[in-house]
Amino acid sequence: MTGDGSAHISKNNQNQHKDRFKFIVNDKSILGPQWLSLYQTDGKVTFAKSHFEQAMMNVIREPNINSTVILRADILKEINHAAEAGSEPKFDESVLKKFEIDNGNESGEEDVKKINIEDLNIRSCETSESLKLSPVHEFVRRIIPRNFYKDAIINQTCLILNSKDPNFQETSLIVYTPHINSEKDCPFYIPRTQSVGILLHQSVLSVHYIPFPEDKTAFTDESERVVRTAYRLLQTANKHSKGVMQGYEKRVNHDQVVNKVNFQNTYIVLKKKYSKFLVENWAESTDPKKHVFEDIAIAAFLIELWIKVYGPDFRSKMQFRDLGCGNGALCYILLSESIKGLGIDARKRKSWSIYPPEVQSSLKEQVIIPSILLRPHPALKRQVPHLEHNGRFFPVKVTHEVIAPATVVYSSEDLLKSPQVNTAEFPPDTFIIGNHSDELTCWIPLLGHPYMVIPCCSHNFSGQRVRFNVRKRSPRSNEIKNQNNSKSTYSGLVDHVEYISSRVGWKVEKEMLRIPSTRNAAIIGVENATLKHFPTQAVYDMIWEDGGAEGWIQNTMSLLKRNPRNH
């Protein structure tokens, strides 16, 4: 670009890239002598200023789009100058928010890194008078990195500037200026510059820097990280502006149930406390990083959900049961956070032995047989109050490498008394967790307690693998996407768990969890007007409607001798 305000194709550097961007470091920046040109689109873009500004407004609020090192941004100050003509820009003091983050570190071994986070003053930026740019929207945002024990939290001014020149009505400039005093303060997740400018001018998109005075030579080398970052910034601005123009809508909407900021803060604290121990001592054959960080995220979500449902003192008001607890990592985290509860699984896992004794004692090797399969129907119970079981018998075939195949017959009375069986008759203050709990997934909404279930594999009430069809199509249906060929299978399972929940009276909420898994839909039931009367007739009807539960006990008892599955 040239200083007279027209789009300019560099004569000094004709480097072409796969995105048809040009490296223009040898060209004078149109923004002024203090600015350095880096990249521009080779030719005119097809999107308008309105598309560009809408896209960049989203990037300002969601800086993790540009860097995976960034967790989020908290908007501390926002001033919109684009008010009615003649009116003064208004700043609502209530918009000013200070988000404090608990170190979560009792030992004082490490502190959260922060730089100038008290500085909330908007930083202005000089630009060429030829463009007649002035701010229309000003922000101060606080950038929170994923690991704020390693990378510093900073504040940053974000400006959207438009031209007052009638010839440049489609000109728009986005400027990022970190609130730091020198290059050495610059955190890893932003380019080492005083300011970054992303300019749309005469339908050409370009990126410019104001370098620190002591460092200008590195910008001529495209292999330098700070230069590569400029390229990526242009990529993002170009891609997202095109997306707005084409009417792109987000496929998944997160944070529908639990506040995003609270969840992320809790996640970071839990990650700091527990990830190192769990990864280093992992005893399973599965990938520790995937499972550890997934369980930490689920624990963070549950804690924030419980605070929302029961209040800050939730620990004194509830306890959990993790059905199908697997490796026990989720239970370990929750129990270590002084939350009462038990984990139950059909098979003890190797990882259980790495936990402290008080955690190990809360992990139970039992199979789940819902009491509804063993107890008399409530109507019969009212007529015969002393009746404790339904008098049924259940033949189970067993095989052994030494003796011939045989059949063991269990009575409902035997199973109710067996220490190997858990009938899911929990205290009234219990909250049930079903984290990829397979055969138990569809059962959990029927057990008469608030719950969160994260479906994984489809099984019916008999424990058999089945495929459920999606009952309805809604705008949310596209949220349930698996990246393998079983998209419709998973969609059907999630939809069916929602249906079961509604069928028996639950007010259903759904959250797409921020976990490293394609099977990340959480179905949550907290409110149910009929809860005191469970199991209701609707529960029996739901089991009957789905084909009954014949075979559940036989299939469940056979789990006692089967190797555990991994997910």
From Swiss-Prot:
Catalytic activity, reaction form: uridine(44) in tRNA(Ser) + S-adenosyl-L-methionine = 2'-O-methyluridine(44) in tRNA(Ser) + S-adenosyl-L-homocysteine + H(+)
Keyword S-adenosyl-L-methionine assigned: yes
GO terms for biological process, alphabetical: tRNA methylation; tRNA nucleoside ribose methylation
Alphabetic keyword roster: Cytoplasm, Methyltransferase, Phosphoprotein, S-adenosyl-L-methionine, Transferase, tRNA processing
Phenotype upon gene inactivation: Increases cellular ROS (reactive oxygen species) levels. Increases RNA level of TRM3, TRM7, and TRM13. Sensitive to oxidate stress induced by rotenone. Mildly slows cell population growth.
Organism superkingdom: Eukaryota
Keyword S-adenosyl-L-methionine in annotation: yes
EC number: 2.1.1.211
Listed GO CC annotations: cytoplasm; cytosol
GO function term, MF aspect, one: tRNA(Ser) (uridine(44)-2'-O-)-methyltransferase activity
Main location per the UniProt record: cytoplasm
Cellular localisation: Cytoplasm
Residue numbers carrying Phosphoserine: S107
Miscellaneous notes: Present with 7720 molecules/cell in log phase SD medium.
PANTHER family in alphabetical order: TRNA (URACIL-O(2)-)-METHYLTRANSFERASE-RELATED
Functional summary from the UniProt entry: tRNA (uracil-O(2)-)-methyltransferase, which catalyzes the formation of O(2)-methyluracil at position 44 (Um44) in tRNA(Ser).
Similarity comment: Belongs to the TRM44 family.
Name the record gives this protein: tRNA (uracil-O(2)-)-methyltransferase
Organismal lineage: Eukaryota, Fungi, Dikarya, Ascomycota, Saccharomycotina
